[in-house]
Amino acid sequence: MAKEFTAVKEPPAASDEAVFRREVVDYWDKRSDTYSNSIKDELGDVHFGAWSEALLSRICPCSAYAASEGLKVLDLGCGPGFFEIILSRSGCSVHAVDSSAQMIEQARANVSLSGNPALVEFHCCDVTELPFDASVFDVVVSRNVTWLMPDPLKAYSEWHRVLKPGGKMLVFDANWYSYLVDDQINQLRLGDQDDSSILEWSEQSFATSEQERRCEALALRLPLTYERRPAWDESVLPSLGFDEVRADERFSELVWTEGEQSYYGTSPLFAIEAQKACLARA
């Protein structure tokens, strides 16, 4: 049963960024096993086909995915390697970045079993400080990552830097922790999340109660917890040099089961597509 939570209205003062980043990495290092289990579940059910269709159709909308072969794709916050499996199977050359060394290890193992490891290169580093030259990637993707950014404008600016002119950015995320700062959303969530069995996930995929509390504490210190998205993203991306910014607020209907859509009814998954402008702004 979902627990009640007393919402706060304003973010606390920013803490030391380096210390906070270490806390985030430590959290995901400790979550890597259960998070990898959830990815393994997705590989074996309807999620894999749904995500493959949704992701590849956005990368190559007019080519029946044939043109994805050879594309240089950067996955930001790769976690246990779900996108790496999809993308490497389609022939993309994938660079996978995550700040958690344990997540990278899980991803390596999962890609070795289910993907094409010859096409995947892993980098353990911060997604806002990338070890790549400018304008080198055809596509950048991220799933369930942007909400975690202490400085989301810095993150988007860095991702824009490494994209080729005309390259595409695909962001999949949700207002995961809006219930912490909105009492009305929290009350709706409590009803939606009364029974987790509707998710039909394996027991090994769930975070522990302690991990959930720790993640909530981190979320309260992150700026995007206090924004309404994807409206916020749509408002800032053009100023960073992105064109053709589009958001799909019903994206979860394409990749989630009915149970997941019900359980996470207050935080549906959205998709953002944006293109790096081909000409430099004056």
Where in the sequence are the language-model features?
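Core SAM-dependent methyltransferase catalytic element
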Residues: 257-282
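Class I SAM-dependent methyltransferase SAM/SAH-binding core
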Residues: 72-76, 80-129
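A short glycine-rich, Lys/Arg-flanked "PGG" loop and its adjoining helix->strand segment in the class I
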Residues: 153-165
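A short acidic, Gly/Pro-enriched loop at the edge of an enzyme's catalytic core
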Residues: 128-139
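Conserved class I S-adenosyl-L-methionine
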Residues: 2-68, 82-86, 168-209, 251
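A short SAM/SAH-binding and catalytic strip from SAM-dependent methyltransferases
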Residues: 139-151
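Short alpha-helix
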Residues: 224-241, 247
